């Protein structure tokens, strides 16, 4: 049996709600593929963390389905993956995603919105 220990970080949404996330290496898989929320995050030279893309999914192992969004995440220097399982249902995941996007305005979420227009 192996045990993985991940650092924990709280991201605060525009509403003021704090959400607890676990920091994983990019490209990681999560046992069981639970539903949840995720952030692709860039760490700057100054150690500042900035979300590049924020999303939600039925399976945390299937985070980015769009090649354009994957290219945006890669091209904008994402260095970390922040995850947490969220079993409260799709609506709760969507609300958390929207709350965080409203606060942080990630560049690749803005690109996704423009593509949908």
Where do the language-model regions lie?
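Short flexible/disordered coil segments
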Residues: 80, 112-117
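GIY-YIG nuclease catalytic motif and its immediate N-terminal context
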Residues: 1-64, 88-102, 106, 115-117
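Canonical phosphoinositide-binding patch of PH/PH-like domains
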Residues: 81-88
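Mid-chain, well-packed structural core segment of small domains
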Residues: 62-75, 82
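Structural alpha-beta junctions
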Residues: 74-78, 102-110
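Short, surface-exposed loop/turn microsegments at beta-strand edges and helix-strand junctions
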Residues: 29-33, 72-78
